[in-house]
Design a protein with these regions (language model features):
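Non-transmembrane functional regions of envelope-associated proteins
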Residues: 1-169, 193-206
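Short, well-ordered turn and helix-capping elements at secondary-structure junctions
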Residues: 122, 180-182
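Non-lumenal N-terminal regulatory segments of integral membrane proteins
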Residues: 173, 181, 204-206
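N-terminal domain-start motif of subtilase-like serine proteases
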Residues: 184-195
Length: 206
């Protein structure tokens, strides 16, 4: 949506991160509406120059254009065997078509409401779409496809060829390691160099 900054500021952030030797930038900021400041083309021009992975959201409805999925499915039709959403909310143009990759950010709460697992893939509009994490691995590896093997028992394997198999349950979910402590930085206090690492950009009201 519109919160909180005009998108030329996002473009500035992307350029600054690559100036500081980011290997890949991932934006966990969905942009389903046009920028009210009219800066979508400024961000689009930056996405032409620098690889950035953007999010999408599985939903009851669809919004904006889905440009397909880099999935290679081996085996059975995934319908009824993976997490499924009728629609997909994508980013506005030109962001969606210029992104290096697009991955969904849906979680999968347990019956008690706690999020312990999240899907690596979802099915929407008859296509298998990667999670933001899986798409980040694919883009970082420069692989044209990610692969999913499906049998009548469900998901048997999810993999990006360069990184190997990702262990999932039979509907393609992975357990979340909440004990992991990724390095966090304020935009006002960035390191001199990210040494080729993957940088995930999120927003906080704090």
């Amino acid at each position: 949506g519109q919160f909180p900054f005009p998108r030329d500021m996002y473009a500035d952030i992307i350029r600054e991160l690559y100036k500081r030797e980011a290997g890949l930038v991932v934006f966990n900021v969905l942009m389903p509406e046009k920028d009210r400041f009219g800066k979508d083309n400024v961000l689009g021009n930056t996405l032409k120059q620098y690889p950035v992975v953007l999010p999408a959201l599985g939903s009851e409805r669809s919004k904006n254009t889905n440009h397909g999925s880099p999935a290679q499915v081996v085996g059975m039709d995934p319908a009824g065997l993976v997490v499924e959403y009728p629609g997909l909310i994508n980013n506005v143009e030109p962001q969606e078509s210029l992104a290096a990759g697009v991955g969904v950010v849906n979680t999968f709460p347990e019956i008690d409401g706690v999020v312990r697992r999240m899907p690596m893939v979802i099915l929407s509009q008859e296509q298998l779409h990667p999670s933001l994490a899986l798409e980040t691995l694919r883009v970082a590896a420069k692989d044209p496809r990610f692969q999913v093997k499906i049998s009548d028992m469900g998901v048997e394997a999810v993999r990006v060829p360069k990184f190997g198999k990702i262990p999932t349950d039979d509907v393609g979910r992975v357990w979340i390691d909440w004990s992991a402590s990724p390095r966090e930085f304020s935009y006002m206090k960035l390191p001199e160099s990210f040494d080729g690492g993957i940088v995930v950009v999120g927003l906080s009201a704090a």
